């Protein structure tokens, strides 16, 4: 027995012992066959992958233990890990980008088509009512709609000037036609324009129609423009956030997560879910848009509700022709009072010789009656879209993406390439250094909370992310201001269009049945000399119209240099004895 004992002591080290426990280091794997099979399927050259483990002293990111990776293989795996992660993020965000882009396109097409429908409807109404009188001078109305389109599509400025110039053009043609027996030199028309621009508003030739039209059009266009711009800004910000280059710390963490198991020779060992969540939260913290994202979505929904309610774009577009006609009727019905005040302030013009008086309009054009807009069919877009449906679709789509940024790490780690399945959470997994269980806490939340992330350093400032959040915050502020009737893009915001609430101040303009609250009077506009176009103005050579003390860009002045025209009401022709 004593002779056998030394022999047993020599054979004991060769006997297999118990394997490592669930919480121990990875099992010793001497073969790289599994790694060669996986990387060979990806197109890696097998000449770069040894058949068995080699010393890992050359590794820069993975544990410097026995490895299946050369330095070149490790660098390629770093790039592959980044591509995989980036692809998952962009695929997850593709629905969000598509949602914002599609809503932007639909709302933009709707608003533009509603303006076209309004212009076409006005042309049909006025052509039916006034015939050749309208067709000869339709350019003034085309100029009005050109100015409205320029504000919505291009400049974002000059809306007040566009509307005020339209009414001024109309007045400079209307007053001489009400008194064809007189000659009106440029100085007289300049005095007339000055009277209508006084702060006390004592002379309102078109009654309250200019103010009411201005309120409806301004609020609706400001809200529509802010909504479309907000959708476009959101789309651009999200698209940029999903495609920004990754920081070096994120690239290294991703390599430890899904690349190092291949180098260790255990590609089938899935990363621990907590490990993946920490890496994903750390990498995405510099891309996420919280908390600005929630406020941005609230701003979109608030403004969309206002556009189908108190700031109805459909109602504002439909009311253009109605408000203009009401203004002309007011001028006709109060012509005696208006003329008396004008003659008192500006003097009595010289009479025109009878042979120089304008010929009356044809009888058939003056006998047509005005037809109220209530008799017209409600306009719809070519696709049959209405604002109510667009807002419902927007609300439904945005409800799906409200928690997008907060849930993006969970979505990414739900992919089978990134982490173990939830059903295998109790099984050993890849911890970053070997087989075991991931014991570090999962850090979620804001960028400040990510400072405690155990997997990567997020303390370095991220200027691009801050810039994107500022863009989103600015778009939100613009939309919330537009929901209050304010245009932040206008340097000289007008009190009539600003309001202090959600539009209830001017409920009479929105068919709400409440009495209007008259806003403060506008400051006086600079006087305008009359234009020289030879239409209905006698006794003066005229002068070019100018805009004193006002600045505007090209987009807001497109429709402001058209010849002035006037649509004479049939009943007014009758009263003037021209039939």
Swiss-Prot record:
Annotated InterPro entries: Glypican, Glypican_CS
Compositionally biased intervals (Pro residues): 517-527
Keyword flag Lipoprotein: yes
Covalent lipid adducts (GPI-anchor amidated serine), residues: 556
Entry keyword annotation includes Cell membrane: yes
One matching Pfam family: Glypican
Sequence ranges of Basic and acidic residues compositional bias: 361-379
Swiss-Prot/TrEMBL GO biological process terms: cell migration; neuron differentiation; positive regulation of neuron projection development; regulation of protein localization to membrane; regulation of signal transduction; smoothened signaling pathway
GO cellular component: cell surface; endoplasmic reticulum; extracellular region; plasma membrane; side of membrane; synapse
Region Disordered: start-end pairs: 347-382, 483-552
Coiled coil: none
Locations listed in the record: Cell membrane
Glycan-bearing residues: 55, 92, 155, 498, 500
Membrane topology annotation: Lipid-anchor; GPI-anchor
Tissue: Nervous system.
Annotated signal sequence range: 1-21
Keywords assigned: Cell membrane, Glycoprotein, GPI-anchor, Heparan sulfate, Lipoprotein, Membrane, Proteoglycan, Secreted, Signal
Cleaved propeptide residues: 557-579
Self-association and partners: Interacts (via heparan sulfate) with PTN; this interaction promotes neurite outgrowth through binding of PTN with chondroitin sulfate of proteoglycans, thereby releasing PTPRS of chondroitin sulfate proteoglycans (CSPGs) and leading to binding with heparan sulfate of GPC2. Interacts (heparan sulfate chain) with MDK; this interaction is inhibited by heparin followed by chondroitin sulfate E; this interaction induces GPC2 clustering through heparan sulfate chain; this interaction induces neuronal cell adhesion and neurite outgrowth.
Family statement: Belongs to the glypican family.
Summary of the function given for this chain in its UniProt record: Cell surface proteoglycan that bears heparan sulfate. May fulfill a function related to the motile behaviors of developing neurons.
Full protein name: Glypican-2
Source taxonomy: Eukaryota, Metazoa, Chordata, Craniata, Vertebrata
The gene coding this protein: Gpc2
